[in-house]
C-alpha cells in the first residue's frame, strides 16, 4: 500500500496569522491544506492519507474532509510539539493501520504545489531504493543596502 502522511500541525507563528493557522488560510475560497490533500486524493497510486493536525483544529479538519469529499483520509491524529514529533505521530498511526511493507510518503500540508509526477516518482524510488526525497533548486534574492559592492562578489 502507498500511504501519504500529511503533517499540518503547525500554528503558523512565523507567518503571524491572527485568526487561524496558515494551513487553513484560503486561496480562491479553499484552504491551502485542501489543495494539498486533493493532490494525494486524486493520485491513483495513493491508497490512504493520514492527516496530522493541531488537536484543537481536528474537528474543523473533519468538516473540510467531508465538504471536499477527501475519502482517502483514513485517520486524523494530533500533532506533536514540533514538526518532527508530528511526523512521528503520523508514521506511528500508519504503522498501526497498514502493513509494514507499505510505502509512506511524508508531505507538508502547506505545500500544495506537489504534482502527480513527483508523487509517482517518489513511490517508484522508494520501491526501488528504500527511500526518496524531493528537492528543488533554491532561488534566493540578495538585498544589500547603503553600500556599493563589486558585482563580481555577488553570486
What are the residue ranges of the model-derived segments?
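Conserved N-terminal catalytic core of the sugar/cofactor nucleotidyltransferase
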Residues: 34-101
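Conserved beta-strand scaffold positions in the cores of enzyme catalytic domains, especially
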Residues: 24, 76, 131-132
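Conserved core of the sugar-phosphate nucleotidyltransferase
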Residues: 113-155
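Residue-level signal for inorganic ion chemistry
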Residues: 6, 33, 90, 108, ...
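N-terminal glycine-rich phosphate-binding loop and ensuing alpha1 helix
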Residues: 2-58
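Short beta-strand-to-loop acidic/aromatic patch adjacent to the donor-nucleotide binding site
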Residues: 98-110
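Structural beta-sheet core signal
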Residues: 4-6, 51, 106, 131-134
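Short glycine-rich anion-binding loops that position phosphate/pyrophosphate groups of nucleotides
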Residues: 10-13, 55-57, 82, 109-112, ...
Amino acid at each position: 500500500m502507498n500511504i501519504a502522511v500529511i503533517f499540518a500541525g503547525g500554528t503558523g507563528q512565523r507567518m503571524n496569522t491572527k485568526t487561524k493557522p496558515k494551513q487553513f488560510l484560503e486561496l480562491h475560497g479553499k484552504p491551502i491544506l485542501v489543495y494539498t490533500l486533493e493532490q494525494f486524493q486524486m493520485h491513483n497510486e495513493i491508497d490512504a492519507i493520514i492527516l496530522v493536525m493541531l488537536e484543537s483544529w481536528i474537528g474543523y479538519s473533519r468538516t473540510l474532509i467531508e465538504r471536499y469529499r477527501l475519502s482517502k483520509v483514513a485517520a486524523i491524529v494530533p500533532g506533536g510539539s514540533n514538526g518532527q514529533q508530528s511526523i512521528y505521530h503520523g508514521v506511528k498511526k500508519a504503522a498501526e493501520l497498514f502493513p509494514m511493507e507499505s510505502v509512506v510518503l511524508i508531505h507538508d500540508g502547506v505545500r500544495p504545489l506537489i504534482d502527480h509526477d513527483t508523487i509517482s516518482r517518489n513511490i517508484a524510488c522508494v520501491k526501488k531504493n528504500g527511500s526518496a526525497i524531493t528537492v528543488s533548486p533554491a532561488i534566493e534574492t540578495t538585498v544589500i543596502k547603503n553600500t556599493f559592492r563589486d558585482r563580481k562578489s555577488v553570486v
